[in-house]
């Protein structure tokens, strides 16, 4: 909606990025409390690493949240320092660090090209967005090799998936780091990109955006774990039809965790709810005369909480007229 952001009051820009930072922190608080406390009986708690023990007591919950706050703050300061060292002015570095650690797409400038100008800065962006899309507990267990290998298969699959998505468009006429940044940004539901709007990959990036990141992360989307469950159960049903005597393996990501009937039901429910919401929202926007393609893209970006950017070919939409 705003044009010429540089003319806005700096305190307003700082408030916008800091509110995003706080929102990301409280969203992590909510996820970790729900996932780590088995008494809530949330249907997906057994599919993603959510701490070593059940946080039933107030003391354990408090300790867990303090650890999250500490790591979240240290990570923000670390990204701020890297951005500042790379040559980005302090004000932009501060706003960008709060945006990146929360997996957002807010910019303190009209264009990301005015902030990011070299490969080192691009690598920092990729690293920051990668961290925001992975399981936040990965940072807890970074130096615990046994837990890292055993409990974070979901994160490994996300990294492998990112590499595959990058390889699929490697031969397009784009710089390598720009491709990686756009793919990771889409998975992290951020929307930050250095790819211009005259690309033919907008639908490709939208599909990646729908997938999202880890269950315990600041990302939106349907989530990779739920897609994995749907694909695996579908393939198992086909195998059962072909070979009824086959031994069915219902483990997820080749771990010790097994997919339960409740996991399957909730995954299908979320999948159907997402596309039903997409249909309803697209229909409402089409009535507003913005065209089917734009309404479809805007609906996906809205449902996945992703910032509109040039890689989705939506640069010419005027939000003030909606």
Region roles according to the model:
Residues 1-322:
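Membrane-proximal intracellular helices of multi-pass ion channels
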């Amino acid at each position: 909606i705003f044009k010429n952001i540089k003319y806005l009051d700096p305190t307003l820009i700082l408030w916008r990025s800091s509110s995003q930072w706080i929102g990301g922190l409280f969203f992590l608080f909510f996820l970790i409390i729900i996932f780590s406390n088995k008494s809530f009986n949330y249907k997906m708690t057994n599919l993603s690493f959510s701490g070593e023990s059940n946080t039933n007591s107030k003391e354990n919950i408090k300790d867990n949240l303090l650890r999250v706050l500490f790591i979240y703050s240290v990570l923000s300061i670390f990204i701020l320092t890297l951005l500042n060292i790379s040559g980005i002015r302090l004000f932009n570095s501060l706003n960008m660090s709060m945006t990146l650690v929360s997996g957002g797409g807010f910019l303190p400038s009209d264009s990301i090209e005015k902030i990011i100008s070299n490969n080192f800065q691009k690598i920092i962006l990729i690293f920051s967005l990668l961290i925001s899309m992975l399981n936040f507990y990965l940072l807890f267990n970074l130096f615990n090799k046994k837990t890292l290998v055993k409990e974070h298969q979901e994160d490994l699959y996300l990294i492998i998936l990112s590499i595959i998505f990058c390889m699929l468009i490697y031969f397009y006429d784009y710089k390598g780091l720009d491709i990686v940044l756009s793919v990771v940004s889409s998975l992290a539901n951020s929307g930050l990109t250095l790819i211009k709007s005259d690309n033919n990959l907008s639908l490709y990036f939208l599909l990646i955006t729908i997938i999202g990141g880890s269950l315990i992360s600041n990302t939106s989307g349907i989530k990779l774990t739920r897609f994995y469950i749907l694909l695996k159960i579908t393939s198992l049903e086909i195998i059962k039809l072909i070979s009824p005597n086959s031994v069915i393996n219902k483990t997820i990501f080749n771990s010790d965790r097994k997919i339960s009937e409740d996991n399957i039901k909730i995954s299908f429910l979320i999948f159907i709810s997402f596309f039903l919401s997409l249909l309803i929202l697209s229909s409402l926007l089409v009535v507003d005369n913005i065209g089917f393609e734009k309404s479809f893209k805007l609906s996906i970006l809205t449902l996945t909480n992703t910032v509109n950017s040039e890689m989705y070919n939506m640069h010419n939409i005027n939000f003030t007229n909606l």
